[in-house]
Regions:
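ABC transporter nucleotide-binding domains
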Residues: 2-5, 10-204, 208-210
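Short beta->alpha junction loops/turns
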Residues: 66, 105, 233-234, 264, ...
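Short coil/loop linkers at secondary-structure junctions
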Residues: 106, 122, 247-248, 281
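Positions that flank functional sites
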Residues: 115, 131, 256-257, 290
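ABC transporter nucleotide-binding domain
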Residues: 171-262
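C-terminal coupling/interaction segments
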Residues: 263-304
Length: 304
């Protein structure tokens, strides 16, 4: 199933939590929402899942406009909130059977058994939820979100508080689930989104500041500064490099220079021409591949 939002806005008093947010999520995508705390990630997820109404804008599932109050589409969405709402005095099977009952599923016991197997809860299935570790509680939350076989899975900070082993196990599980479903997960951990997702949407102060494939966002083609690495055999001064058209700032790291340019500026031909004109030996000239963390900081700090 596909999801589209058009100019979605949400206000809490005078605070504009979302400001004309438009996204398009295609069937089968695994997308990461990235943003600082309070950026609007959870608010957008709650609007998509029907837990919050938008104040402005439109929302579509498979091209059909969702009318406020019509929540029939929720049967196609599985949702794991940031604070996983479990009942600690219930056994795992009890909790999942009750969850399945809300959707009027047939063969409830069979479906619960399938979810326990899928989420790796087999060894813990006879325990009460209060006796489970954080990692296994997250698995129970995932099993609940998947119990009715939704087409879309929404995961809000699904790995918060997990240890490194639990973290990798949940990431692996999410990747497996995404083979058959559209998955949106939110995080403020860049490494997590980079490890799991194939597309990232960066949200800051209620606005979309980047949207693209992981490689595309890291390449510097979405509005952030570009960095070129240059190394000369001969000595070159900072002033000489700043005089090259398009270069906005420079920094020296050992024997190499980092040359900063605007997002739409290709400075490598100008640097090469500078080397030729000054009879310099150019040992290195390449675009610096940024990591997602540096792009994130650059985009969110620009907005702030």
């Amino acid at each position: 199933m596909s999801i589209q939002t058009s100019d979605i806005s949400k206000l809490f008093g005078k605070q504009r939590a979302l400001d004309k947010v438009s996204i398009s999520v295609n069937k089968g995508e695994l997308i990461g929402f990235l943003g600082p705390n309070g950026a609007g990630k959870s608010t957008l997820m709650k609007i998509i899942t029907g837990y919050l109404p938008a104040d402005e804008g439109e929302f579509f599932i498979n091209g059909d406009k969702i009318i406020s109050g019509n929540l029939d589409y929720k049967k196609d969405i599985g949702y794991l909130p940031e604070h996983n709402p479990l009942y600690p005095d219930l056994y795992i099977k009890e909790y999942l059977e009750i969850s399945a009952g809300f959707y009027g599923l047939k063969n409830v016991k069979k479906r619960v058994t399938e979810m326990i197997e899928l989420t790796g809860l087999g060894i813990e299935q006879h325990k009460k939820i209060r006796a489970l570790s954080k990692g296994y509680r997250q698995r129970v939350g995932l099993a609940q979100a998947l119990i009715h076989d939704p087409s879309i899975l929404i995961l809000d900070e699904p790995t918060t508080g997990l240890d490194p082993n639990q973290l990798e196990e949940i990431r692996k599980l999410i990747r497996e689930i995404s083979r058959e479903k559209t998955v949106i997960l939110s995080s403020h951990i860049m490494q997590e989104v980079e490890a799991v997702c194939n597309r990232v949407i960066i949200i800051n102060r209620g606005k979309i500041v980047a949207d693209g494939g992981i490689a595309e966002v890291k390449s510097g083609n979405l509005g952030q500064k570009q960095i070129v690495i240059a190394e000369f055999k001969e000595s070159v001064s900072k002033e000489q490099l700043l005089a090259i058209e398009g270069i906005e700032d420079v920094a020296i790291l050992g024997n190499t220079w980092e040359l900063e340019a605007g997002p739409e500026t290709e400075i490598r031909p100008a640097v090469y021409a500078f080397a030729v004109a000054n009879k310099l030996t150019l040992l290195t000239l390449m675009q610096k591949q940024q990591n997602l963390e540096s792009v994130f900081h650059q985009l969110t700090q620009q907005q702030n």
